[in-house]
Amino acid sequence: STIPHIFFHTLVVDTSRAFDDNIAISKQDGMNKVKDYNYVMTTVDEFCRILEEMYTRGYVLVSIYDVASYETQADGTQVMKHQPIYLPEGKKPFVLSVDDVSYYEYMTGHGFASKLVVGEDGTPTSEYTNSDGSLSYGSYDVVPILDDFVETHPDFSYRGAKGIIALTGYEGIFGYRTSDFWYNSNCDYFDQYFSWNLENNLKKKQTMYQPNPNIEQDKESAKQVAQACRDDGWLFASHTWGHNKVGDSGSYERFESDSRLWDREVKPLLGDVDIIIYPQG
């Protein structure tokens, strides 16, 4: 049988901001984002109703490692093997992931959560910036909302499974601006990764660069969030460092450079990751 994979982006909390042509303007390039948000985003209310509907229809969240895992052969090689999943009759497994949990700068002020933080109980929760600039903390995005749902519907999760958090790295992770490449004035390895189009990329860096004086503290905060997510049952995946559509454009050299940069800037914050979720499919 097939096991569906359902994925989401960061959830829209305040529709009055996200879908307002006068508010949802990217501060980076001046582009109106309403059409994009309407096309690829889900609201908090929609997400909650989707979870309820899937639960009613008998779907059960499973880990991707419940579906298949590595088995070591006699010669030392490893192969992927399907794993048995034991669910009650009438139940159907599915895998869930959430892309781009970086809370990109262009989304600032548009009615989305602003970052993931570690809550008072040690589990991941959301920081949300209200329209008046004040901060609230709670279930404003996929991770804490799904956690809440599983807590009240434990039979929705197989063996404590949660979802996969797919992360890029070019603006950091979880809402923390952790990329030395973009945010550290002392970064000295730009040309090591972008030699394939160095002149144009140097020009782009000059327009994109925004220093973060708190970058080292942000890295530590991101590590704490990563550990809290892992302890809570969440998995991590690479979404490529630069959100590159793999195999459709660019060279192998470009993909290799991107992968090495992800390993350099994101892996130290997350730990080992062996899943990749391709941007744009």
Annotate each language-model stretch with its function.
Residues 1-27, 31-40, 96-102:
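Boundary/entry segment of secreted carbohydrate-active catalytic domains
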Residues 6-18, 74, 79-80, 87-94, ...:
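Metal-dependent polysaccharide deacetylase catalytic core of the NodB/CE4 family, i.e.
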